[in-house]
């Protein structure tokens, strides 16, 4: 049993939880809790190590035992040590270090999300969850966007990251993909108070939907790349919507148009 927070394995987990740089260098990230672990493993992501405490649920213990049978390195950890790694109020008693992988892009893209300078982890995770539900084929993370595999984004995404192909790209790369002659994607940018009302735009065509950050909106590069601006009419007195709420409305307007 690991009983010290200074244990090298615990220190490695702490670094992966805290720093994007370490996640990239080690090509791995950490998921916390039974549900997220089940989502990751059920979607084909490979665990490198699993850590648990005596506080684990029966469901979690079954997961741990299954990974032990598969030869995964499993470590029991003192509850207080494992809890020190969590930024939630109650530690679920289970962590897994997962090997990073890149899900393949479909050969023909028709519906893409671009997260542009989205810095709030909760917003990005919620948007990715909505995108996966709406049938988005891939999400491109433009410069200034928070890491999709940080702990808070993973929790808010509820497993979307394990099913939705993600790419961290420059705007030059995004435009190159969207403007391929064989199957170009129209770039629609959501901009508060500007552009055509979303239901007046033709969202049945192949498209990439750009969603900017809540505080400052899309980047200058995102605005320059956009083919058309979209707005969500707000007859009330609020000046703007939460970025995740706005993205959900836009994503499912695409779904509505394509299903009717």
Where are these regions (language model features)?
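Short beta->alpha connector loops at strand-helix junctions that form conserved
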Residues: 77-78, 116, 142-143, 165, ...
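Boundary-proximal intrinsically disordered activation/regulatory segments immediately upstream
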Residues: 1-61, 145-146
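A glycine-rich helix N-cap at a beta->alpha junction
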Residues: 65-87
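Active-site/ligand-binding-proximal alpha/beta "capping" segment
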Residues: 188-238
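RNA substrate-binding interface of SAM-dependent RNA methyltransferases
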Residues: 99-194
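Short acidic-hydrophobic, aromatic-tinged amphipathic segments that line or gate anion-handling sites
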Residues: 1-4, 73-78, 164-174
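Structured adenosyl-cofactor binding patch, chiefly the S-adenosyl-L-methionine
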Residues: 96, 133-134, 148-161, 220-260
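Amphipathic alpha-helical repeat scaffolds
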Residues: 33, 119-127, 241-246
């Amino acid at each position: 049993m690991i009983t010290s927070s200074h244990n090298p394995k615990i220190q490695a987990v702490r670094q992966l939880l805290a720093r994007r740089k370490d996640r990239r260098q080690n090509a791995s990230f950490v998921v916390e809790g039974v549900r997220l672990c089940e989502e990751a493993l059920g979607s084909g992501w490979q665990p490198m190590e699993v850590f648990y405490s005596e506080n684990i649920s029966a469901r979690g213990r079954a997961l741990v035992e299954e990974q032990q049978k598969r030869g995964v390195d499993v470590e029991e950890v003192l509850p207080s040590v494992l809890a020190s790694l969590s930024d939630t109020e109650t530690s679920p008693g289970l962590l897994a270090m997962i090997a990073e992988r890149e899900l393949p892009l479909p050969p023909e893209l028709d519906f893409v999300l671009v997260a542009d300078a989205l810095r709030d982890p909760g917003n990005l995770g919620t948007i990715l969850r909505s995108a996966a539900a709406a049938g988005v084929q891939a999400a491109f993370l433009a410069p200034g966007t928070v890491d999709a595999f940080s702990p808070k984004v993973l929790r808010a995404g509820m497993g979307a990251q394990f099913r939705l192909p993600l790419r961290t790209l420059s705007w030059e790369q995004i435009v190159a993909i969207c403007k391929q002659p064989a199957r170009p994607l129209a770039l629609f940018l959501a901009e508060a108070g500007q552009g055509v009302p979303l239901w007046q735009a033709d969202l049945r065509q192949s498209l990439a939907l750009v969603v900017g950050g809540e505080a400052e909106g899309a980047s200058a590069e995102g605005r320059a790349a956009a083919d058309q601006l979209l707005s969500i009419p707000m007859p009330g007195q609020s000046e703007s919507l939460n970025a995740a709420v706005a993205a959900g409305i836009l994503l499912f307007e695409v779904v509505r148009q394509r299903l009717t």
